[in-house]
Amino acid sequence: MKVININKIDTNREFLCENEKYKTIFFKFDEGKGFPNHTHNGYASIQVIDGIVDMKFENGETFELKCGDFLPFDARIEHNVIARVTSKVLVTIIK
């Protein structure tokens, strides 16, 4: 085990933890950037640690996520994430 200070991460993507059950990834998105439509094979969560992102699902649900917001979701539903401003998020994907 090790402590990771996310405030000291200076890359746009950093795998924080990965094992046979889940993975947690830090992402930094510039304004207007993010992920195009995609899916995963299970459930996931996103936590905004800085900035604001829009998350949209193919079923019509949309969320404006701000600093401190946490959203668990069914990642089998196609979704995308776009930053409104430079943003930092933690994404956990259950395998």
Sequence positions of predicted segments:
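Short histidine-centered beta-strand/loop micro-motifs
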Residues: 15-18, 27, 35-40, 57, ...
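Glycine- and acidic-residue-biased ligand/ion/polar-headgroup-sensing regions
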Residues: 42-54
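Ligand-binding loop in jelly-roll beta-barrel domains
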Residues: 75-95
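Short beta-strand segments in beta-sandwich/barrel cores
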Residues: 25, 34-35, 51-56, 70
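A cytosolic small-molecule/anion-sensing beta-strand core signal
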Residues: 49-50, 66, 85
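A short glycine-rich, His/Asp/Glu-containing loop-to-beta-strand
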Residues: 2-33
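Short acidic-glycine-tyrosine-enriched beta hairpin
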Residues: 59-75
